[in-house]
Amino acid sequence: LVVRALRPAPPGFDPRREARWRVYRYRILMNGTRRPLERHRTLEIDDRLDVEAMRAAAARMVGERDFASLGSHVHGRTVRHLAEVRVTRRGDLVDVRVTANAFLRRMVRSMVALLLEVGRGRLAPDGVDRVLAGNARALHGRAAPPRGLTLERVVYEAAGQSNQGTPESTTT
């Protein structure tokens, strides 16, 4: 945990509702590689993933759309704006980084489960479109395990800034 700045919050400040962007990271260690010191924050799988196919599928998730099929116990508004879904690979480590204005419960883990299906060759990248178009819960409610998920960053609007841009262009 790193604290980069500390300021008093205005009266009535609600950190959940006033966040502009949230960034989650999900770590996957593939090919049977094991790192005992990281096992509580990394999903370890035996499969080799097609990272290029995962990137193609991730690109189809970006934008403003209804994500009801990727949330659990969905109540209320289910439209979210995904600014970025980035899949990167370094050796056997695959990182999925998701930036959005808000998330539904279990949404990121469901997105990762969907990307894992693509990476394993069980679903074509364009299959993501069909999943997102459906109102039923994707993958029969399955989500990736929580151990790979980390809330990496929350961005709040700084005084005097407009409500535009992504986390990379704003102050935290």
Report the location of each language-model feature.
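Structured-RNA-binding interfaces characteristic of tRNA pseudouridine synthases
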Residues: 1-172
